[in-house]
Swiss-Prot record:
Cellular component GO terms, alphabetical: MICOS complex; mitochondrial crista junction
Cell membrane keyword on record: no
Protein name: MICOS complex subunit MIC12
Any one GO BP annotation for this protein: cristae formation
Length: 100
């Protein structure tokens, strides 16, 4: 019985994986694969490494028009805020386990 169960589970997982691959990459000439964000990022990185595409450096002027005041924070303050937000989320989750 154990061998039949192992074979059945292996066959099921293999067929689901094969069907997913077929529907994602082969069916409709790979439409979903070609349009995926993962493929676009991979192609862009490959072009950058090969030197076919140049990396455009952006400055703050590309994002803001006119004079603006930009506030900068230290890395310590940023990490402290992230830590506090995570502690609050954890405490909220723990209290939510208590019910109503």
């Amino acid at each position: 019985m154990s061998k039949i169960w192992k074979f059945t589970s292996f066959a099921t997982i293999s067929s689901v994986a094969a069907a997913s691959l077929y529907l994602y990459a082969i069916d409709k000439n790979g439409y979903y694969y070609e349009k995926s964000k993962f493929k676009q990022v991979t192609d862009r990185v490959r072009k950058l490494i090969d030197g076919d595409e140049t990396f455009k450096y952006v400055t703050i002027d590309d994002f803001v028009s006119g004079p603006t005041q930009i506030q900068t924070r230290s890395r310590g303050e940023t990490f402290k805020d992230l830590w506090n937000a995570e502690v609050r989320r954890t405490a909220q989750w723990i209290y939510s386990l208590g019910g109503r």
